[in-house]
Amino acid sequence: MNAWMILAAEAVQEAEGGLFDLDATLPLMAVQILVLVFLLNAVFYKPFGKVLDDRDQFVRGGRQDAKARLAEVKALTAQYEQELAATRKQSQALIAEAQTEAGRIAAQQLAEAQREAQAQREQAQQEIDQQKAVALQALDQQVDALSHQILDKLLARA
């Protein structure tokens, strides 16, 4: 065990120096750090930054595209609503016109039917009057004939 203590004491005496020894270790560590920084920058940070920039551009492009499409959709919606309102007005005008035309046609047909009915009634009245005149004339003839027969029978009895 003494041998180990002696070796440890010699090692402590040989490692004399302050906090910073100016030997080749310090510049070598600085070179290693610079090489590590350049390697990390080339291998990791630049590609990672490029991916982030590409993603940011993609998101911005998507947003701009979405805004443009939204504006287009709003414009088309407004246009379609205007066209729909115009079409509704036209259809209402057509319906009103059709109703007016149907009313006019119905009134014409009703007037025509009334005229035809009046004409048929007048014709029937004329036929009835003619038949009445014929019947009255036939009755007058029969009355005359019966009156002559009655008169002849009365005169024949007397």
Curated annotation (Swiss-Prot):
Q: Which GO terms describe its cellular component?
A: plasma membrane-derived thylakoid membrane; proton-transporting ATP synthase complex
Ranges that cross the membrane: 24-44
| Example of a GO MF term | proton-transporting ATPase activity, rotational mechanism
Superkingdom of this entry's organism? Bacteria
- Keywords in UniProt for this one? ATP synthesis, CF(0), Hydrogen ion transport, Ion transport, Membrane, Thylakoid, Transmembrane, Transmembrane helix, Transport
Q: Which Pfam families match?
A: ATP-synt_B
Its membrane topology is listed as: Single-pass membrane protein
Location relative to the cell? Cellular thylakoid membrane
> What does this chain do?
F(1)F(0) ATP synthase produces ATP from ADP in the presence of a proton or sodium gradient. F-type ATPases consist of two structural domains, F(1) containing the extramembraneous catalytic core and F(0) containing the membrane proton channel, linked together by a central stalk and a peripheral stalk. During catalysis, ATP synthesis in the catalytic domain of F(1) is coupled via a rotary mechanism of the central stalk subunits to proton translocation. Component of the F(0) channel, it forms part of the peripheral stalk, linking F(1) to F(0). The b'-subunit is a diverged and duplicated form of b found in plants and photosynthetic bacteria.
Q: Which HAMAP family match?
A: ATP_synth_b_bprime, ATP_synth_bprime
| Subunit architecture | F-type ATPases have 2 components, F(1) - the catalytic core - and F(0) - the membrane proton channel. F(1) has five subunits: alpha(3), beta(3), gamma(1), delta(1), epsilon(1). F(0) has four main subunits: a(1), b(1), b'(1) and c(10-14). The alpha and beta chains form an alternating ring which encloses part of the gamma chain. F(1) is attached to F(0) by a central stalk formed by the gamma and epsilon chains, while a peripheral stalk is formed by the delta, b and b' chains.
Family per UniProt? Belongs to the ATPase B chain family.
> Know the name of this protein?
ATP synthase subunit b'
Species per Swiss-Prot/TrEMBL record: Synechococcus elongatus (strain ATCC 33912 / PCC 7942 / FACHB-805) (Anacystis nidulans R2)
Gene encoding the protein: atpF2
